[in-house]
């Protein structure tokens, strides 16, 4: 997913990072595992974005939609019960995370949280402070503005499916 990249000591949104490498590369650092050719790296991402604690969050929603995502997704700290910050999926950060980690297959979880939405938004690029647009992950995301693509919701109970072939077209798109 894209959360661990934002918190990675080397690739995260410093100073809002952890002291470790919670990425595919961090596996080798922590246990001495030597990757070989043909290694499959599974990336896991939510269908929306959430964040614990401080730090830049371009797609954060401060309205009722953000609260709805938080409630439906049970986005509360397990120990403290603290509300997590929620927003639309940030494809700029997700693409960056996929690239840095060498992800070979992406698994999308919690898509059922968005089942009831007529439309959803996906951040496909950023507007930088100077007005230019980029779909590359910039060094500093503190003041970027998300550029969204609005998509039709799938309006289907995603928990009923057992294979990718069953997914509705609106979800696959």
Give the residues covered by each predicted segment.
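Short, small-residue-biased leader/transition segments that mark boundaries at the very start
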Residues: 3-4
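Short Gly/charged-rich anion-binding patches and loops
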Residues: 22-23, 92-93, 173
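Extended hydrophobic packing segments that form well-structured cores
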Residues: 148-173
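A glycine- and small/hydrophobic-rich beta-loop-beta segment
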Residues: 27-150, 158
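Hydrophobic alpha-helical scaffolding
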Residues: 13-17, 31, 82-87, 164-168
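Short beta-strand-to-turn element immediately C-terminal to the catalytic PLP-Schiff-base lysine
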Residues: 7-8, 30
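A short alpha/beta connector and helix-capping loop motif
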Residues: 9-23, 101-102
């Amino acid at each position: 997913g894209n959360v661990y990249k934002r918190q990675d000591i080397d690739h995260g949104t410093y100073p809002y990072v952890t002291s470790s490498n919670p990425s595919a590369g961090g596996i080798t650092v922590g246990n001495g595992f030597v990757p070989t050719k043909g290694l499959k790296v599974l990336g896991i991402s939510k269908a929306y974005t959430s964040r614990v604690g401080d730090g830049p969050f371009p797609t954060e929603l401060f309205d009722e939609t953000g609260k709805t995502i938080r409630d439906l997704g049970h986005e509360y700290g397990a120990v403290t019960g603290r509300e997590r910050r929620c927003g639309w999926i940030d494809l700029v950060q997700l693409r960056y995370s996929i690239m840095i980690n060498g992800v070979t297959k992406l698994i999308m979880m919690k898509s059922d949280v968005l089942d009831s939405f007529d439309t959803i938004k996906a951040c496909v690029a950023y507007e930088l402070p100077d007005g230019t647009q980029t779909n590359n992950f910039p060094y500093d995301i503190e003041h970027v503005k998300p550029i969204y693509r609005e998509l039709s919701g799938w309006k289907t109970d995603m928990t009923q499916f057992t294979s990718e072939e069953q997914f509705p077209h609106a979800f696959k798109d």
